[in-house]
Amino acid sequence: MYSEMDLYCKLFVETQLDRAALVRFVAQTVTGTENRSTIVSPWGEVDVRNNDDYNEDRAADPHDGFLFYRYYLDIEPVEDADPGEYILSIAQLLEALWKSGAKAVAACDFEEELPRKGGMAGE
């Protein structure tokens, strides 16, 4: 089922946390180890990046505003990661971000398998 699927995922995140706090939050959520702005977990690597396209006004657009959120997370599986576990872990990260009050939207080939279709389906 997953053999042909690209497992790269980009999560756009809008939060009041600064980047260092977001890195800590993600590391705790995914039970990972921090190395500057990269978190390594048993299932994947997460890079927390500032979004060069960040624009507070454009981020409010209900259709594609997520493209202008303050941060994005580049997420890739580690070698030999189980695809099902990897996708479930991203789903759990999304849920934790939403629960914290952050806005988060996933852009990946498996959005349909994530809660709220990766954040595009609203509440």
Language model regions located:
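Short, extreme N-terminal segment that most often corresponds to the first beta-strand
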Residues: M1-G32
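Intrinsic low-complexity, intrinsically disordered or marginally ordered coil/linker segments
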Residues: M1-Y8, P62-D74, E79, E113-E123
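Structural motif
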Residues: F12-L17, E76-V78, F110
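Short, surface-exposed beta-strand/loop "edge" segments at domain boundaries and coil↔beta transitions
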Residues: R19-L22, E79-E85
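Short, intrinsically disordered low-complexity segments
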Residues: T33-D82
